[in-house]
């Protein structure tokens, strides 16, 4: 009975015993030391009830919540891998609550400036995070200065005051304005007009650099040339070179920016001009040399203009080519030299001379002609070519070459009759250029040797070929000259 009462007391007093402990601020050891001591008693066997388990879980949760509580003033913990990934891919991001951004502050935004009318598009605005480097941005020149080339990104000393005070100056209508504070989400929708001159009636920039104005304005100026040490001795080089041969008062790059050029290679011939470093459509101006006494940019020999940006080194220019005479290759008669006269030209020359009508002549039917004595024509052709062995068989084979070329044709059904295919005007203009007739040779240039001639000695031994000595021949008689 006593054990049953004791067991009943434990069943009823366990929740109250645990509830008398601190509700979560105590340690786990103090919360469990009481029931553990009673459960270890050999005389007490408490029944397992689900309420005890729920009480243990509730104390575990209260302990965890108490340890996990962090004051609101402390910063939250960010794992290391998160910061490492952001360091390589994006700017460092703090999870700590930031103060109110100055971009949303109406006192620091562009809303304090009065709205200006822009007829050519939106303003050229950038984020306020880039305000410190804005001092080196390319600004438009002073109202009284001349048009300056974009090749000079850094201004001179007299324009620096204007750059510092340009943040508070009001721009002229119709041109862009670089705002000091602007929204980071507002993107420029039009071309930044701050590179153009602010005066509406002043002349624009030089034409070869107009293509730079069609690009959007970057947040930082593009420095394409190496900046050298500024020497005050060359301060006058930035003045307009009007008295030194300047064109229309355009200003060439000042002494603040020095374009480095390669040294002249004296191994090449000075007559052949190499690739010019500047493609100018007018006369060129090169930089001053250290040994020159004159200040500024000196005028040198005019550069050769090249229309494209391709480096072309021609072998010779038009002015360097020597003009040869028209008759350089025609000092004498045009066909005097060996090999210069062609066969069809030789035939036209024979037909054009009336004294040759006994061995070659026109037939009167268009451009047809007949070789009355073909062997004589072949002999004369052999004299022109210095070939004594020339005959009509060789001449006729040469004429077949002109059949394929469309110059001559053989008249069918007639012997030694040919015709020219082309018109007479074209024929004589091609055969006699500049109306010069060929000078035909009447004899060979050198003595004829026996090797160049056909041997005819065997014909002298036969009496049949000498009718004046052998009398009338009887070819079919028994004593005739022909024996078979």
Curated annotation (Swiss-Prot):
Source organism of the structure: Homo sapiens
UniProt tissue specificity: Expressed in keratinocytes.
Signal peptide start and end residues: none
Family: Belongs to the ETS family.
Matches recorded under SMART domains: ETS
Entry keyword annotation includes Nucleus: yes
Domain of life according to the entry: Eukaryota
GO biological process, one term: cell differentiation
Pfam family, one: ETS_PEA3_N
Compartments in which it is found: Nucleus
Gene3D superfamilies linked: Winged helix-like DNA-binding domain superfamily/Winged helix DNA-binding domain (1.10.10.10)
UniProt keyword terms in alphabetical order: Activator, DNA-binding, Isopeptide bond, Nucleus, Phosphoprotein, Transcription, Transcription regulation, Ubl conjugation
Sequence position, cross-link Glycyl lysine isopeptide (Lys-Gly) (interchain with G-Cter in SUMO): 96, 226, 260
Record-annotated DNA-binding residue ranges: 341-421
Name this protein carries in UniProt: ETS translocation variant 4
Annotated crosslink Glycyl lysine isopeptide (Lys-Gly) (interchain with G-Cter in SUMO2) location: 6, 139, 322
């Amino acid at each position: 009975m006593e054990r049953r009462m004791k067991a009943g007391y434990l069943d009823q007093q366990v929740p109250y015993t645990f509830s008398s402990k601190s509700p979560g601020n105590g340690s786990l050891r103090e919360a469990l030391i009481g029931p553990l001591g009673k459960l270890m008693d050999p005389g007490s066997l408490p029944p397992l009830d689900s309420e005890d388990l729920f009480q243990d879980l509730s104390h575990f949760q209260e302990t965890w919540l108490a340890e996990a509580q962090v004051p609101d003033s402390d910063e939250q913990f960010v794992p290391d891998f998160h910061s490492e990934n952001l360091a390589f891919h994006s700017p460092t991001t703090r999870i700590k609550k930031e103060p109110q951004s100055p971009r949303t502050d109406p006192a620091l935004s562009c809303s304090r400036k009065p709205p200006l009318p822009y007829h050519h598009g939106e303003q050229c605005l950038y984020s306020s995070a880039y305000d410190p480097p804005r001092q080196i941005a390319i600004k438009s020149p002073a109202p009284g200065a001349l048009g300056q080339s974009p090749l000079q990104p850094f201004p001179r000393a007299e324009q620096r005051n204007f750059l510092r005070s340009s943040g508070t100056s009001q721009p002229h209508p119709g041109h862009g304005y670089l705002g000091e504070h602007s929204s980071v989400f507002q993107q420029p929708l039009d071309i930044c007009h701050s590179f153009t001159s602010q005066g509406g009636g002043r002349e624009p920039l030089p034409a070869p650099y107009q293509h730079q104005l069609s690009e959007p304005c970057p947040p930082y100026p593009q420095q394409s040339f190496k900046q050298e040490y500024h020497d005050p001795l060359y301060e006058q080089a930035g003045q307009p070179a009007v008295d030194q041969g300047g064109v229309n008062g355009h200003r060439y790059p000042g002494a603040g920016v020095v374009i480095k050029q390669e040294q002249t290679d004296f191994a090449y011939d000075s007559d052949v001009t190499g690739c010019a470093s500047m493609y100018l459509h007018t006369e060129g101006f090169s930089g001053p040399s250290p040994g020159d006494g004159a200040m500024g940019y000196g005028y040198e020999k005019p550069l050769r203009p090249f229309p494209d940006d391709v480096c072309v080194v021609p072998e010779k220019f038009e002015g360097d080519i020597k003009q040869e005479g028209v008759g350089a290759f025609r000092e004498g008669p045009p066909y005097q030299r060996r090999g210069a006269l062609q066969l069809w030209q030789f035939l036209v020359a024979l037909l054009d001379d009336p004294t040759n009508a006994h061995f070659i002549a026109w037939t009167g039917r268009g451009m047809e002609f007949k070789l009355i004595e073909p062997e004589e024509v072949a002999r004369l052709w052999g004299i022109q070519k210095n070939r004594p062995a020339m005959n009509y068989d060789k001449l006729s084979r040469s004429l077949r070459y002109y059949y394929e070329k469309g110059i001559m044709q053989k008249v069918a059904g007639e012997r030694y009759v040919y015709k020219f295919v082309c018109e007479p005007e074209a024929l004589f203009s091609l055969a006699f250029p500049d109306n010069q007739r060929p000078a035909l040779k009447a004899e060979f240039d050198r003595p004829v040797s026996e090797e160049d001639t056909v041997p005819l000695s065997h014909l002298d031994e036969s009496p049949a070929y000498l009718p004046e000595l052998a009398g009338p021949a009887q070819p079919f008689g028994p004593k005739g000259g022909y024996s078979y």
